[in-house]
Amino acid sequence: MLQTFATSHNVRMVVVSIGGNDFNFASVVQSCVTDFLASPSWWPDYCYDDASVKANFTSTNIAAVRAKIKNALLNVRQAMRNAGYADAGWTLVVQTYPSPIPAGAGFRYSQSGYTRQSTGGCGFWNKDADWANGTALPTINGAVRGAVIDSGIAGAKILELQSAFNG
């Protein structure tokens, strides 16, 4: 699709957001919200220690995802070459992932009761939010950054979005 488009248009930049789905990010978020809604504040069930969540962040999986991202970026470069572009004739921009939630202390609503979910729209335990911001997101973004380096694509840029929603 990119190659076909680039053949008939003057493409100067390709922006890529990649990797989150390979860490099953949506399933992780779903687990965190489910654990928040299904456990009381006096006995919270955290998602960060669920086996299904932890499996996404093993060193083996991190390395595999990093390699997949690198290969996808190389495919982008090859598509541009096939469309007739010199490597210096376009720029690859790879986005890191923004944090969709604050750290635990940054929530507007208490984690006791359901107002954090029903009013605030973000049912996460503080510990899970801290884990997401302090471990999961840096791991995902580290894999993205590493894959850009591993790809060796000259002139590739990284657009750092991790803190884009802060404040």
Task: List each language-model region with its residue ranges.
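Alpha-helical cap/lid subdomain in secreted, periplasmic
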Residues: Q3-G167
